[in-house]
C-alpha cells in the first residue's frame, strides 16, 4: 500500500497532534465542548480546495487506493455541477442505474441515508450547505438526508455500484460497528505495526463484515417511528427554521 497520498490531509480532532514522513498533514484542533458537526463545518471552511474526500477515523484502508478512479470522479464533477457527491461505498437499498458514470449508481431522492458519512468525494460547498451545527454524526446522517431531499433534490448523489471493488478499500461501515471493534481489525492493525490497543474496552461485534454487507433491507437500522408532532419538530430543526432545545 505504498505510494503515499497526493493530497493534503486535514485531521479534524480535539487535541491530538500528528505528523508522518512523506505526508502533508495539517491538524485542525477544536474544543471538546464543540459539537461534532460544528467541528466538521469549521474544518471544511478552513480547507481551500473545491473538493474534499471525507473519511471518518475508523475507516482503516486495507488495500491500494484506486487513484485513477478518484481522478476520474474529480473530472466528472468538474464537468457536471449538479453532482454533489460520489460515495465510494455502495448503499444497502435499491438505486437507479442511470448509466451516467461507470461504476456508480444514482441514489433516489427519497432513498434511505441519501446523505451518509461513508468515504466519499464531496463538492465542498454542497457538503457545508447540508450540514447544520449542533448535531452528532447519527443526527447528521438522519437530518442531512431529510435536508438533501427537501432542499437539494436537484443535486445528484451517487454511490458505488454493489459488488464492485471499493475505490478506497476499508471494512464495510468502518472498523467499529455499533460501538464495537470488527473481528478483522486486530490483524489489519498488526500489519501496520499498531499494537497498543486494548480491545477489551469496546469488545467485538458478533456480526462479521460480510454479514453487515448482506443485511436484508428490513434488518438495516433506521430511525424509529415517532409521533407526528416530534417528527415535524425535528424536521423544522433540520431545516434551521427553529432551534433545538438544550
Q: Model-derived features: where do they sit?
A:
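Catalytic core and acceptor-binding pocket of nucleotide-sugar-dependent glycosyltransferases
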Residues: 115-180
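Short beta-strand-to-loop acidic/aromatic patch adjacent to the donor-nucleotide binding site
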Residues: 50-60
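PAPS-dependent sulfotransferase catalytic core
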Residues: 158-206, 210-211
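Active-site nucleotide-sugar/metal-binding loop of Leloir-type enzymes
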Residues: 41-51
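N-terminal anchoring/stem segment of glycosyltransferases
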Residues: 1-31, 46
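Membrane-proximal basic amphipathic "stem/tether" segments
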Residues: 195-246
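Short, flexible, basic/aromatic active-site loop/helix in glycosyltransferases
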Residues: 99-112
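Conserved donor-nucleotide/metal-binding helix-loop-beta segment in metal-dependent transferases, i.e.
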Residues: 64-94
Amino acid at each position: 500500500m505504498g505510494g503515499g497520498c497526493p493530497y493534503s490531509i486535514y485531521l479534524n480532532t480535539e487535541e491530538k497532534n500528528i505528523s508522518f514522513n512523506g505526508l502533508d498533514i495539517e491538524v485542525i484542533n477544536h474544543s471538546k465542548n464543540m459539537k461534532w458537526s460544528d467541528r466538521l463545518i469549521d474544518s471544511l471552511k478552513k480547507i481551500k480546495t473545491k473538493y474534499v474526500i471525507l473519511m471518518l477515523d475508523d475507516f482503516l484502508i486495507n488495500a491500494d487506493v484506486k487513484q485513477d478512479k478518484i481522478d476520474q470522479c474529480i473530472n466528472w464533477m468538474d464537468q457536471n455541477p449538479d453532482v454533489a457527491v460520489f460515495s465510494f461505498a455502495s448503499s444497502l437499498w435499491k438505486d437507479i442505474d442511470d448509466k451516467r458514470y461507470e461504476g456508480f449508481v444514482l441514489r433516489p431522492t427519497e432513498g434511505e441515508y441519501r446523505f451518509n458519512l461513508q468515504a466519499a468525494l464531496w463538492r465542498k460547498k454542497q457538503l457545508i450547505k447540508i450540514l447544520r451545527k449542533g448535531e452528532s454524526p447519527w443526527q447528521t446522517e438522519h437530518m442531512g438526508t431529510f435536508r438533501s431531499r427537501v432542499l437539494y433534490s436537484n443535486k445528484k448523489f451517487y454511490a458505488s455500484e454493489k459488488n464492485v471493488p471499493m475505490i478506497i478499500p476499508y471494512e464495510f461501515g468502518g472498523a467499529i460497528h455499533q460501538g464495537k471493534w470488527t473481528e478483522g481489525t486486530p490483524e489489519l492493525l498488526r500489519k501496520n505495526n499498531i499494537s497498543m490497543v486494548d480491545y477489551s474496552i469496546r469488545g467485538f461485534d458478533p456480526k462479521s463484515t460480510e454479514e453487515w454487507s448482506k443485511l436484508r433491507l428490513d434488518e438495516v437500522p433506521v430511525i424509529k417511528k415517532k409521533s407526528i408532532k416530534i417528527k415535524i419538530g425535528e424536521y423544522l430543526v433540520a431545516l434551521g427554521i427553529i432551534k433545538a432545545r438544550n
